[in-house]
Regions:
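Alpha-helical transmembrane segments in multi-pass integral membrane proteins
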Residues: 2-15, 25, 29-53, 74-78, ...
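Short, charged juxtamembrane terminal tails flanking transmembrane helices
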Residues: 2-6, 365-370
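Residues within membrane-spanning alpha-helices of integral membrane proteins
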Residues: 17, 21-24, 61, 68, ...
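His/acidic/aromatic-lined binding-pocket segments of jelly-roll/cupin-type domains
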Residues: 62-64, 201
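Residue-level signature of the transmembrane alpha-helical core
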Residues: 21, 28, 97, 101, ...
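Residue-level recognition of transmembrane alpha-helices
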Residues: 20-23, 87-88, 148, 298, ...
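Membrane-interface helix-loop-helix regions
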Residues: 35-59, 67, 75, 86, ...
Length: 370
């Protein structure tokens, strides 16, 4: 049976749970202070006066990718490709379906005056990459989840080929080379999606930080880490042109560069801190709510906010964000665990059935040959 248990606790990095919350907090600031969901073609922004600061909150997503690179490298260690895939699927999919469905129902029942949703859209979103089926994401924030899934698929393939993490240096050099070739010359949309060419540097930083965390110390590691951080910073600055056209914002590349370097430096430093002066249950709760909070904060948050008042202010926005945090905690505390258990049981039974069918099929062939 594939190994899908959580990795043992002693080597947890508790401060990463706090950094996850900080990254999600930056994204929430971005969506409530600079760029919210569109209602009938009009962009909703609860507190536009925060825009000069809030506009840089988009960097919370790529910083989260760096944290994900570290966590996924740790999660993959000692697992089979199938075990890793089941563990990742059971981690992200049940919570996604719960939060996406809550967002859909709230929009359908309460937010229909501001936002349009359909059952077809809900059905397409069950596959996460809804635009592949001609439907929009249920929540505009879901685009980053697709990138995460692509990253998981690559890691599972590398595990199957036996080159992860053994050939991590080669993987990262090739990945960064493809990134720059596509970003500077080819500009092929398929390559951008397939190789995560807009965010590869951040994932690479996380993977290399994990190498350092495992005890590796050599010149090549530090050189690659510098290259990956430079790539990540380049990618963040490179996004500004498109982001400026899309949002009509005015971004300072120097500010983006500084935020990237400092944020990635903090992630690196965090892995050297073994404990924090906070209750372990609180730290685990903080880490646990970040995923459902990210999935719920935007569309569902604005549905609640606009139902309260057509002209949001700081107080109403704070109340809504607090309510979404509580809802995220409820999802994590009471719904996520049972849903994950059901998914793991179902996937493991399906995997066992497939293996048994293949075994019987090969057994039949062997007898036929004899």
């Amino acid at each position: 049976m594939p190994d899908v248990q959580e990795q043992p606790g002693p080597t947890r990095v508790p401060i990463l749970d706090l950094l996850r919350l900080a990254a999600v907090g930056a994204v929430i600031l971005y969506h409530y202070g600079f760029w919210g969901p569109a209602s009938h073609g009009v962009q909703q922004v609860a507190m536009p006066y925060l825009a000069p600061v809030a506009q840089y909150g988009f960097l919370g997503v790529p910083v989260f990718f760096a944290i994900s690179g570290f966590v996924i490298a740790y999660s993959a260690e000692g697992r089979t490709p199938v075990g890793f895939a089941i563990a990742r699927f059971s981690r992200i999919y049940p919570t996604f379906v719960i939060c996406m469905t809550l967002t859909f129902l709230a929009t359908l029942l309460v937010g229909h005056a501001w936002f349009h949703v359909t059952w077809g859209q809900w059905l397409a979103n069950l596959f996460i990459a809804a635009p592949m089926f001609g439907q929009p994401y249920m929540d505009d924030a879901y685009w980053s989840l697709v990138i995460e899934v692509v990253f998981y698929v690559w890691v599972a393939l590398f595990l199957a080929w036996g080159i992860f993490p053994r050939r991590i240096d080669t993987i990262i050099v090739a990945w960064i080379a493809i990134t720059f070739v596509n970003e500077l010359t080819l500009d092929i949309p398929l390559f951008e999606k397939l190789f995560m060419a807009d965010d590869s540097g951040f994932f690479a930083v996380g993977l290399l930080i994990y190498e350092h965390y495992r005890g590796r110390r050599d010149t090549r590691l530090y050189s690659l880490l510098t290259l990956a951080m430079g790539t990540a910073t380049f990618q963040a600055v490179h996004k500004l042109e498109r982001l400026g056209v899309h949002t009509h914002g005015s971004f300072d590349p120097m500010v983006v560069t500084a935020i990237c370097i400092v944020s990635l430096g903090i992630v690196f430093a965090a892995t050297r801190i073994k404990s924090v002066p906070l209750p372990d249950s609180l730290v685990r709760a903080v880490g646990g709510i970040t995923y459902p909070l990210y999935l719920l904060h935007l569309q569902l948050g604005y549905v609640i906010l606009l139902a309260m008042t057509p002209t949001p202010d700081a107080l109403s926005t704070a109340l809504v964000v607090t309510a979404v945090v509580v809802l995220a905690w409820f999802v994590w505390r009471f719904l996520e665990g049972p849903a994950r258990f059901l998914v793991v049981e179902g996937v493991q039974e399906t995997h066992a059935l497939v293996e048994e069918c293949l075994r019987l099929r090969h057994g039949g062939r062997d007898r036929h040959v004899q």
